[in-house]
């Protein structure tokens, strides 16, 4: 997705490879919602081309960093700034007001090529995790690319001045970064996905390829075989591998190795070679558009979803999104990229003329209230979690576990532990008034995307979640509360996918052995779109809800399970949905503030309902 790099040893098949990578990214984003590996191909190609260019420049003794960075800025910045400016303007007109602060913040980060660090920070922020994907979220990869363009020439220059072996240095960078990627993906996958250190090896892989590929002359038939193997392997990568929850890590070797195979195969000269297809005029032209296509497709997709108020695009909608993105990409290439590339503008002047007004505009974009046709202004806690008046300390079992004790007047009559992720946190709004009335002490142990289980339910193999759960269970057994409040079910994805995972039941058995009662609540429905976004665009209309039969099975999944005797179940589905529908509003209260969390305002309105239900399953 990096802009094409001018090179005297131009290889037409690389433009076709860019085109394939861009199409994979777009198609997977629009219809499949999965990682395709296309971005990793862009990283490898950039490493290959830039390293080759730098090595040739140093060999001639003509490595001018100022000129190099200026050329790179003229290739990368114009289209990026145009898309950011257009996105900011369109967002102010069409996005729900609640999305403006996030959009402005990320536009600034993207303009400064720091979006990956913004998203990495959000991935470790308990509250930021629940924000909807912004219209410029895809700039994370461009930010890493920009950082690469800034730092890589310095690395090559230092290695040259110190007369070290570039091959050995790149091997060390490759191994260290790949090792970091594998480790951090296992420990904290959301952070690993956006972290620069976990991606540098992909550029180093391309750099290593640039150093050795010219030394290897493959027989034609081997080149044909290698090229097609790489291309076909790339096309099926996202389908064969469930890469989303374990990426980048070692799985990123698949798309990068496939792309490396295509590059190593080179121009075979065979009419049966993959390079002949990739070097065809349509794919080369699409390769020229690949950077702009990548820039445009995501804001067009997000804008479509917001305006339609749904979470899926369908076949016709997807074709429309891709077509619109291609038209915008072609226009940007013709009217922005090419004129700027041919101009004599200095990169410094261009940045000053565009970046400063863009950042200033993003800073002043703030919500000013509901727009015409939107829902009435909502209270703050209708769009967020309820605050919890508590004092937190680190668990004696682990510094990773925060235990938050609700404040009470005098000795508590009961101690109740809430343990799990945000879907348990939302019940604080209902339980806090009960605790205040009855003199209970609420004790919260919460971790985003980490339900109370013996397994990592949402991110397979997440060691941080596994450790946190083990420590939480040990802390609960030490505390011996009157009962534990946790989830009974979870949705694997949108639709009738609700399950009671075996890991939940195993934790209940562990507490049963310690004679600690468990109250397990059925999870609320998960939508394919943000209910709040839909309401703010379209108002409280039925399209912002969903038929109950599409979200909730008539019988909860735990009904026929063999569970320990210490477990009691609660199900508030009839208060979140009517008999036939799960509407956006019940009465005049917004039910959900995103696609899967109940608003604090609505949850607080259920406090007496929750209290009566608890009386039925616990000692009053």
PLM feature spans:
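Membrane-interface helix/loop caps of multi-pass membrane proteins
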Residues: 1-344, 357-359
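Extracellular/periplasmic envelope-modification machinery, especially enzymes
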Residues: 243, 306-334, 338-620
């Amino acid at each position: 997705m990096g802009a094409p790099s001018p090179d005297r040893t131009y290889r037409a098949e690389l433009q076709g490879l860019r085109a394939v990578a861009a199409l994979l990214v777009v198609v997977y984003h629009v219809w499949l919602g999965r990682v395709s590996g296309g971005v990793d191909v862009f990283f490898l190609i950039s490493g290959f081309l830039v390293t080759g260019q730098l090595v040739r420049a140093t060999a001639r003794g003509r490595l001018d960093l100022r000129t190099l960075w200026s050329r790179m800025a003229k290739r990368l910045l114009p289209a990026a700034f145009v898309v950011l400016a257009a996105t900011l303007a369109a967002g102010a007109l069409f996005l729900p007001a609640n999305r403006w602060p996030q959009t402005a913040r990320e536009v600034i980060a993207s303009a400064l090529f720091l979006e990956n660090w913004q998203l990495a920070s959000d991935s470790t922020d308990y509250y930021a995790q629940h924000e909807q994907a912004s219209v410029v979220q895809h700039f994370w990869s461009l930010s890493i690319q920009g950082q690469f363009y800034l730092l890589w020439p310095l690395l090559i220059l230092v290695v040259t001045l110190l007369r070290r072996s570039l091959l050995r240095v790149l091997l060390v960078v490759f191994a260290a970064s790949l090792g970091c990627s594998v480790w951090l993906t296992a420990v904290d996958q959301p952070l690993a996905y956006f972290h620069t250190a976990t991606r540098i090896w992909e550029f180093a892989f391309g750099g290593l390829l640039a150093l050795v590929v010219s030394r290897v002359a493959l027989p034609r038939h081997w080149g044909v075989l290698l090229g097609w193997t790489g291309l076909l392997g790339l096309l099926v990568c996202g389908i064969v591998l469930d890469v989303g929850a374990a990426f980048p890590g070692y799985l990123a070797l698949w798309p990068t190795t496939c792309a490396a195979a295509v590059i190593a195969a080179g121009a075979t000269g065979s009419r049966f070679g993959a390079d002949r297809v990739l070097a065809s005029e349509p794919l080369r032209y699409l390769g020229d558009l690949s950077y702009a296509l990548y820039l445009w497709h995501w804001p067009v997709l997000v804008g479509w979803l917001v305006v339609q108020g749904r979470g899926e695009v369908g076949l016709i909608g997807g074709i429309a999104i891709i077509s619109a993105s291609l038209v915008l990409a072609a226009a940007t290439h013709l009217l922005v990229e090419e004129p700027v590339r041919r101009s004599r503008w200095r990169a410094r002047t261009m940045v000053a003329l565009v970046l400063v007004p863009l950042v200033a505009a993003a800073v002043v974009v703030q919500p000013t209230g509901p727009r015409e046709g939107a829902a009435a202004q909502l209270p703050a806690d209708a769009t967020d979690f309820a605050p919890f008046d508590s004092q937190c300390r680190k668990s004696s079992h682990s510094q990773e576990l925060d235990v938050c004790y609700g404040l009470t007047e005098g000795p508590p009559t009961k101690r109740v532990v809430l343990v799990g992720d945000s879907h348990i946190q939302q019940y604080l709004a209902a339980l806090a008034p009960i605790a205040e009335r009855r003199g209970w002490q609420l004790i919260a142990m919460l971790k985003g995307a980490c339900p109370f289980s013996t397994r990592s339910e949402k991110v397979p193999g997440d060691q941080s979640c596994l450790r946190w759960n083990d420590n939480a269970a040990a802390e609960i057994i030490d505390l011996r509360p009157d009962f534990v409040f946790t989830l009974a079910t979870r949705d694997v994805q949108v639709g009738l996918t609700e399950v009671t995972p075996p890991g939940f039941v195993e934790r209940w058995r562990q507490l049963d052995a310690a004679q600690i009662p468990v109250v397990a609540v059925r999870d609320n429905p998960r939508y394919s779109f943000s209910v709040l976004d839909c309401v703010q665009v379209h108002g409280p209309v039925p399209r912002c809800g969903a038929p109950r039969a599409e979200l909730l099975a008539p019988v909860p999944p735990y009904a026929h399970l063999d569970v320990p005797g210490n477990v009691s179940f609660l199900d508030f589905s009839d208060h979140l949905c009517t008999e036939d529908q799960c509407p956006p509003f019940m009465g005049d209260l917004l039910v959900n503030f995103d696609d899967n969390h109940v608003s604090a305002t609505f949850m607080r309105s259920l406090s007496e309902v929750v209290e009566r239900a608890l009386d039925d399953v616990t000692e009053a």
